[in-house]
Swiss-Prot record:
GO terms for molecular function: ATP binding; metal ion binding; methionine-tRNA ligase activity; tRNA binding. Homodimer. The gene is metG. A motif ('KMSKS' region) lies at residues 331-335. Binds 1 zinc ion per subunit. It comes from Stutzerimonas stutzeri (strain A1501) (Pseudomonas stutzeri). This is Methionine--tRNA ligase. It is an enzyme of class 6 (ligase). PROSITE patterns: AA_TRNA_LIGASE_I, TRBD.
Amino acid sequence: MSEARQILVTSALPYANGSIHLGHMLEYIQTDMWVRFQKLRGNQCIYVCADDAHGSAIMLRAEKEGITPEQLIANVQAEHSADFADFLVNFDNFHSTHSPENRELAELIYTRLRDAGHIATRSVTQYFDPEKGMFLADRFIKGTCPRCAAEDQYGDNCEKCGATYEPTELKDPRSAISGATPVLKDSKHFFFKLPDFEAMLKEWTRGGALQESVANKIAEWLDGGLQEWDISRDAPYFGFEIPGEPGKYFYVWLDAPIGYMASFQNLCKRRPELSFDAFWSKESSAELYHFIGKDIINFHTLFWPAMLEGAGFRKPTAVNVHGYLTVNGQKMSKSRGTFIKARTYLDHLNPEYLRYYYASKLGRGVDDLDLNLDDFVQKVNSDLVGKVVNIASRCAGFIHKGNDGVMVEANPEPELWAAFQAAAPSIADAYEARDFARAMREIMALADRANAWIADKAPWALNKVEGKQAEVQEICALGVNLFRQLVIFLKPVLPNLAAAAEQFLNVAPLSWDDHATLLANHKLNAFTPLMTRIEPAKIDAMIEASKEDLAASEAAVPAGNGELAKAPLAAEINFDTFAAVDLRIALIEKAEFVEGADKLLRLTLNIGDATRNVFSGIKSAYPDPSKLEGRLTLYVANLAPRKMKFGMSEGMVLAAGPGGSEIYLLSPDNGAKPGQRVM
């Protein structure tokens, strides 16, 4: 047997400013399954995480609730911990970035970077809220767009016309926090010299640590030239003060990944057999894996390895990136009841249903995963209840009734048993490669073979034939052994089902190596149902409860939906003014990200006999722009072209919604054709 590996695994830190939802759970379930597989194989695999507990958002929410930030993050951590535990996510340690360990490590890494010449300082001019006494990030500044005069726009981007600009260009700026008129003020900021590590990053990102598509994306940033990274924020700020710099704080993304190290260090204090340096020193032979979403790859594949390199620590073995979660083919929606909190799900359904469904769809890539609720019900009921559990329920009764619960020593179908044995290495390889979907397909193919064999032998019919009872016992003994095999293969995904099966099988906790053995002359415990089918009514109840979550979280609204109160009707215009706007149907032929733009997508539009290029500020609502391709939309064709730093924008597309994730691109009814005029 090969020597046990030493592995440290992390998931991205959940922000301590709200509840966990099913989109978050995708990552933690994915990570937990991989960790459980490693432990099942006998490796030393340690899984740590923490709440990301710093930043202005937490400070402001705590102020709004009339509590301290410390009280807020303690309350949220208790909620997060309960949700994770009930979803069977088994951290070895779940800590907080607001901890003595994280402060100590953040200061250590910063001072090492500073002393090595990797920190720069310079003056930055920013808007300052004189009423709150704080500098304002772009998202905390609102005003009138300098391009289209739309009101209530953010400090760097107009969500109506798609323009990007500097906060100082915004007309009638105001603080989104206090409503006060901000003033420009200079402040000393601290920058991490990321370009110092460009050569190292080019080599590391192409060295096998990243999925190919992620490495390709990072290469775009590297080829475009790296910029120094602003790592400081001014007081008031909830976080750690920079050593020797009163009133200056580490930006939340500086100390957040250090939280991985801090959580592990905290665990080391409670488990003296663990050594911090054995996992984090530059000479470490241990493996280090980060599981993250595709929205934060720049922090984990550029800033983080550069910080570690500059401070004399080891870099990650690999960073595993996953896509976003959609529900029923669309973004999670509060109004549709598909923005489902972890606790709302747990109030209605077994967590292992979702663990299995996620596993069945999680491959090696970074594609988005769709939770189709009809498919979810069908797959769980068919695979887990109809295939896996069905084998045990078919066979257990005959063994109890015919042989007092004792499995006979028999293998009446050596070829089938050998097929299960032969599949084990491939299933293990799929788990190791984090290709859970392939592992589930191979496991269910085995379950199909076992069920087909039992159906062909029909022990229920043989049991009625005199003299066939011994054959029935042999068939059912092998059936239970095949069930035991499937339980071993599924144990990383379904730990509760495995524990219940171990109780029925009357065995100690199963390890991966147990798949090579047959139970013989072995007494079983009484069989009880191991998993029940999903009732569609429970899905409906969960959706309704999610809508109620939304209603409960919103203050009472006036009659109607309140949209006119948010955006009053504009001044009346005559028909000629309206007719001057040339609205056309446009086919989106291509939709893509704009490098360097936080909120823009580049759309190539077919308007019948011509194509147009448009930049639109809808990125936040459409994280996978390729899904817009082939869709019809409404296009303002005679708007004067506008030169932007990313290129020329030739008109604009129409969308509704308040902004952020709630932007809804308008589409015509069926039958409309590109180029047709909208009247």
